[in-house]
Regions:
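C-terminal auxiliary extensions adjacent to catalytic cores
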Residues: 2-23, 27-34, 38-41, 46-49, ...
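Generic N-terminal targeting/processing segments that precede catalytic cores or assembly contacts
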Residues: 7-99, 118, 125, 209, ...
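FAD-binding core of FAD-dependent oxidoreductases
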Residues: 54-68, 72-76, 83-108, 136-158, ...
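Generic short alpha-helical segment signal, independent of protein family or function
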Residues: 65-68, 81-89, 101, 105-108, ...
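Alpha/propeptide regions of enzymes that mature by internal proteolysis
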Residues: 91, 111-116, 217, 306
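FAD-binding glycine-rich core of flavoenzymes that anchor FAD
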Residues: 111-138
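Cysteine-centered functional microenvironments
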Residues: 135-140, 317, 321
């Protein structure tokens, strides 16, 4: 299947399909016409332009008052890409780099950036052939666009930098020769069009949202298993209470739990306790708030990826070139910080349920092992979960509240959205690990609950339990736990 880039709305769901199904991507007629029209207009303006145009006939940042001669405009753009490729730190994971390529091509396709058709096409050639530029996590302030990471993304276009191809990192020029591609001679404004933009932040956000939806679903499944294993009550999930406080996420979570628990024998057993701890009783409110946060951030990010986010903006029909600030990452930096907080809470409440399951309450043995003392059982997985959620709390300090002036004060307020983006990914990875540890504990506890109660949970929960037991066994005596935690993580991926 091939996805055609057009001016139609590109959704998170569609992006997920493109990435997971390894679909090819092509420019549609609408996009081609818009790109060529804008480039033709910009070329014509270069012939008789009577005033300086930022980034087109001038230097960049605080060098905006330096006028560049017409015969050096191409060199200006070439120099920009080379000089701005200053990233450091770990490399960006390949899935996110693929998204960066696609989102950059999408943004340039609206015909307000001035890119050549061959430039946009080459971005898609890299995407379609899984030739991924080596991009580094550190270097962007999330304001003048994601300058450093997008420079690394763009280096291969001019035959420089490195790419990941068929599992190996190689000089892009080598791969270009194999593909029969020539380095592109960037024209006026093109380097700036490539580097100005929020595609580093947006790609991280898109990848994160895909994972957030998956983990939110797993949190409900695992939470329901923990509820059954802990001999929890069903009343907090009944619809009447949630009609009094109709947050969509809360209602959706309660409804989901009632579906997961439908037909359970365990949930109908007589309960001596009147109510459950908050980590069980308030699952609809907490998991629901996370769902609402995901939904809100998704709406913001979808708006962002369907936008032109470089500078200046070119308007051929209006005969205008406007220098403005669509590259500023604040609109997505704040939501990404908020999403990190939401996912951290999903891990926080999960860790509390882990703690309850190993505490020797409601008939369950201490640390979920038949002979505690000789065996430590599930004592230390909770330590691991506690360590992870503690780290998340530090990672959730908002990046977007910080700003450091740059470029001799010309760029005096920045979003730090790139830091929000990379921190968000770490929080999500951590959340996945905590949920996997909860599943590890919940399945062990459910085995004991089966023995204690003599009956079973619902078909849905028992199905998950049965599938999980095919990869992670019941633990009778102490064993090497790390591989089992890793298998648990892989199970929910």
């Amino acid at each position: 299947m091939t996805h055609i880039i057009s001016h139609e709305h590109l959704s998170l769901g569609r992006l997920k399909e493109i990435i997971e199904n390894h679909e090819k991507v092509e420019l549609g007629p609408e996009a081609v016409a818009a790109i060529e029209k804008c480039r033709k207009y910009l070329d014509s303006k270069m012939e008789d332009i009577g005033r300086p145009v930022y980034g087109v006939t001038t230097g960049f940042g605080s060098l905006c008052n330096v006028t560049i001669p017409a015969d050096q405009l191409s060199q200006l753009q070439h120099n920009l890409v080379m000089s701005h490729a200053c990233g450091t730190g770990e490399t960006v994971r390949p899935q996110i780099v693929r998204l960066m390529l696609l989102l950059k091509a999408q943004s340039l396709s609206y015909g307000h950036s001035g890119a050549q058709l061959i430039t946009v096409q080459r971005l898609l050639d890299m995407f379609n052939n899984d030739i991924l530029p080596v991009v580094y996590q550190q270097g962007s302030l999330g304001a003048s666009g994601d300058l450093a990471p997008l420079a690394h993304l763009s280096l291969p276009l001019i035959g420089l930098g490195e790419v990941l191809y068929k599992g190996k990192v190689r000089p892009s020029k080598e791969v270009w020769d194999e593909m029969g591609w020539e380095p592109i001679s960037l024209q006026s404004k093109e380097g700036l069009a490539l580097l100005n933009g929020t595609q580093f932040m947006s790609a991280h956000a898109i990848w994160s949202l895909i994972q957030c939806h998956r983990l939110s679903e797993w949190a409900d499944r695992i939470g329901a298993m923990s509820l059954e294993a802990y001999d929890g009550r069903v009343e907090p999930f009944l619809p009447l209470t949630h009609q009094l406080r109709p947050h969509k996420g809360q209602i959706d979570t309660a409804t989901r739990f009632m579906t997961l628990l439908d037909g359970s024998e365990l949930i109908r057993n007589h309960k001596e306790h009147v109510q459950d701890p908050y980590s069980f009783r308030c699952i609809p409110q907490v998991h629901g708030a996370v769902k609402d946060s995901i939904r809100y951030v998704e709406s913001v990010i979808e708006n962002e990826i369907n936008s032109a986010t470089d500078n200046p903006n070119v308007f051929p029909d209006e005969d205008m070139i406007i220098s403005a600030g669509n590259f500023h990452g604040e609109p997505i930096a704040i939501p990404m910080d908020a999403l990190a907080i939401a996912m951290s809470e999903l891990a926080n409440i999960s860790e509390r349920r882990i703690y309850r399951l190993i505490s020797g309450q409601r008939g369950l043995p201490k640390f979920l092992v038949a002979t505690p003392g000789l065996n430590s059982g599930f004592m230390i997985p909770q330590y691991t979960a506690a360590s992870i959620v503690s780290q998340n709390k530090g990672l959730c300090w908002p990046a977007s509240v910080d700003s450091i002036p740059s470029s001799q004060g010309q760029e005096d307020h920045v979003s730090m959205g790139s830091n929000a983006a990379t921190k968000l990914v770490r929080v999500i990875d951590n959340c996945e690990e905590v949920l996997a540890i909860e599943l590890f504990n919940a399945a062990q506890a459910l085995d004991f609950r089966h023995q204690i109660a003599g009956n079973k949970s619902s078909e849905a929960i028992e199905g998950i339990f049965s599938d999980y037991r095919k990869v992670v066994p019941f633990i009778s005596d102490d064993v090497y736990m790390h591989p089992l935690i890793q298998k648990s993580i892989e199970f929910i991926r």
